[in-house]
Regions:
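Alpha-helical interaction segments
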Residues: 5-6, 31, 114
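Intrinsic-disorder/low-complexity, polar/charged segments
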Residues: 8-15, 123, 169
Length: 190
């Protein structure tokens, strides 16, 4: 079975050092991979926007998708963290009712999570590096969303925030070439 994190050794670190694709590709969006002090969690529930959290539609707002990231930042941003290299649970993947939204999650919700981490104190250079990496599939996923329409989350996209603001990152543009390279590589293998 493939591990969620590529980490091979346990590591003590600071909270924001967890936000790295070399630690966890989803930047803590996979809630099931986290263990934390419940008391700190409960003491910081006030940061949630309950009105936006109740918005209908799977992954429709940052708050109904990533509410726990707001809590994590409020509760743990000044805390030490521990990365356990050996998996403590088995989490299987298979059918996901939101699988058609994966491109949307990767190029909209993950960058939004990084923006939020930055607003809560993440180092600028770490933010820029990580955000650039997160946009490695930007154009091909954006076109998939445009073609797929509402069922792929097009109705949740804010063109200015989710498209234009990401064009300053090199990987947004390189994503075109990455996509072509992967396609050519697949054809050569066949």
């Amino acid at each position: 079975m493939k591990k969620h994190s590529p980490m091979k050794k346990n590591k003590k670190t600071k909270f924001f050092q967890l936000i790295d694709h070399r630690v966890c590709f989803d930047y803590l969006l996979g809630f099931y991979v986290n263990a934390f002090r419940r008391e700190l969690w409960c003491n910081n529930l006030n940061v949630i926007n309950k009105k936006l959290m109740k918005t209908s539609g799977t992954w429709s707002t940052f708050d109904n998708t990533c509410f726990f990231i707001r809590i994590f930042c409020s509760a743990f941003k000044n805390s030490n963290a521990f990365i356990c290299a050996k998996p403590l649970s088995v989490n299987l993947s298979g059918f996901r009712e939101w699988s058609n939204l994966y491109p949307f999650v990767e190029i909209v919700r993950l960058p939004e999570a990084l923006d939020y981490y930055r607003s809560e104190g993440m180092n600028f250079w770490q933010y820029a590096y990580t955000k650039n990496y997160s946009l490695r599939n930007f154009f091909n996923y954006f076109f998939k969303i445009l073609i797929g329409g509402k069922k792929m989350g097009l109705n949740y996209i804010n063109f200015k925030n989710h498209f234009l603001k990401n064009l300053i990152y090199p990987n947004a543009w390189f994503s075109i070439f990455y996509y072509i390279w992967r396609k050519v590589k697949l054809e050569v293998i066949r």
